[in-house]
């Protein structure tokens, strides 16, 4: 008799995706982040659902409803901080997942890669709208500044901003719609993640060597299920240390002050995971130019497959490209630091240099390094 997991229509899908899936025998811990992102997403949806049961999306009560969750709701404080810090863990996993894709040439699966970019954009939009909901000072001013960037769009800019606001400033209508979008988008992310996996399973996983692994596959369960559980437990450990020991480490103290349209905070800055893009935005003196650079800083990922000049897939055996990759990582860390600094000398210059280097590395230096490596190997 055929095993039920192979015969039942629903079990068959789960079986072919998580149990009998043939996986390369040599994938490292860098391949754990896909499943960790799934864990993060489920955690965010569950904690978010419980928060939404007590939150009120109204300018007069939003801030106090969050206070009420933390003070009066049973275990409300831990749900709130797991949701806030869960977002940070989500982005850490996202950046490492994308970094792994860049390093090992996973972008050579174009459908999987492009859906991944759409997922990244959607997640960033969701996180931005979630940050507005507590209606603190940084929520309000962050929403005002970031939505205002759309006014840089020629001709229709102002109308576009007022359409998104639902009025002439960030107000009740803005908060209500942001809450609606913040609630629905994670489910769209869930659907996109399923499509992401669907395309990945069409080709099979890449592996650190970049060499086709069809001749050496092992079943996903138990080898990688146990590895994923270890990863999830490690993630849970880091998250709970953050939540229980320093829940406000990654937040902004200004957000503990209720939103006040009459008082601007001295330094308006987004959450830490947007700082690199914010630094690129600020490094260009022109408004429209800054907005374009901001969008391109993420959208540049879409043309990475076109810039692949190497005869090898990954960077495992390419020391020159490895040096440039880690320079890119250092550059992104520099941009993240600059994004959180005030707009004054020497930070302006450092930000501009780091922004130029970011685009130079991806568009010029890395493709050239690949060509040099090909020639050195006489390929």
From Swiss-Prot:
Tell where it localizes: Mitochondrion inner membrane
**PROSITE patterns, alphabetized:** CYTB_CTER (PS51003), CYTB_NTER (PS51002)
Task: Tell me the cofactor note.
Answer: Binds 2 heme b groups non-covalently.
Question: What is an example of a GO molecular function annotated in this UniProt entry?
Answer: metal ion binding
Bilayer-spanning residue ranges: 33-53, 77-98, 113-133, 178-198, 226-246, 288-308, 320-340, 347-367
> Per UniProt, what is the membrane topology?
Multi-pass membrane protein
Tell me the PANTHER family matching this sequence: CYTOCHROME B
Subunit structure of this chain's protein = The cytochrome bc1 complex contains 11 subunits: 3 respiratory subunits (MT-CYB, CYC1 and UQCRFS1), 2 core proteins (UQCRC1 and UQCRC2) and 6 low-molecular weight proteins (UQCRH/QCR6, UQCRB/QCR7, UQCRQ/QCR8, UQCR10/QCR9, UQCR11/QCR10 and a cleavage product of UQCRFS1). This cytochrome bc1 complex then forms a dimer.
Q: What is this protein called?
A: Cytochrome b
Lineage in the entry?
Eukaryota, Metazoa, Chordata, Craniata, Vertebrata
In the UniProt record, the gene name given for this protein reads MT-CYB
């Amino acid at each position: 008799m055929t095993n039920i997991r192979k015969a039942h229509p629903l079990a068959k899908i789960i079986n072919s995706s998580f149990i009998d899936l043939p996986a390369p025998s040599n994938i490292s811990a860098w391949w754990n982040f896909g499943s960790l992102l799934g864990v993060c997403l489920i955690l965010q949806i569950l904690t978010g659902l419980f928060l939404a049961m007590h939150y009120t999306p109204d300018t007069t009560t939003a801030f106090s409803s969050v206070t009420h969750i933390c003070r009066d709701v049973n275990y409300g404080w831990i749900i709130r901080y797991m949701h806030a810090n869960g977002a940070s863990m989500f982005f850490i996993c996202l950046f490492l997942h994308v970094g792994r894709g860049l390093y090992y040439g996973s972008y050579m699966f174009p459908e999987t890669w492009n859906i991944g970019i759409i997922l990244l954009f959607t997640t960033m939009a969701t996180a931005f709208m979630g940050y507005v909901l507590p209606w603190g000072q940084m929520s309000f001013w962050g929403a005002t500044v970031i939505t205002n960037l759309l006014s840089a769009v020629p001709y229709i800019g102002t109308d576009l901003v007022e359409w998104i606001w639902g009025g002439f400033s960030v107000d009740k209508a803005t908060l209500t719609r942001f809450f609606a979008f913040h609630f629905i988008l994670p489910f769209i992310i869930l659907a996109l993640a399923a499509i992401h996996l669907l395309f990945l399973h069409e080709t099979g996983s890449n592996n650190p060597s970049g060499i086709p692994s069809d001749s050496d596959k092992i079943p996903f369960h138990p080898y990688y299920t146990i590895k994923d559980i270890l990863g999830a437990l490690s993630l849970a450990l880091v998250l709970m240390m953050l939540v229980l020991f320093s829940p406000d480490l990654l937040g902004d103290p200004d957000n503990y002050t209720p939103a006040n349209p009459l008082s601007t905070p001295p330094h308006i800055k987004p959450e830490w995971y947007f700082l690199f893009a914010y630094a690129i935005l600020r490094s260009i003196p022109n408004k429209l130019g800054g907005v374009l650079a901001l969008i391109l800083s993420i959208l540049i990922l879409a043309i990475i497959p076109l810039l692949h000049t190497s005869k090898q897939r990954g960077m495992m055996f390419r020391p020159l490209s490895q040096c440039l990759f880690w320079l890119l990582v250092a550059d992104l860390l520099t941009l993240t630091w600059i994004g959180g600094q005030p707009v004054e000398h020497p930070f302006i210059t450092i930000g501009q240099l780091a922004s130029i280097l970011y685009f130079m590395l991806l568009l010029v230096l890395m493709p050239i390094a690949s060509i040099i490596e090909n020639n050195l190997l006489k390929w």
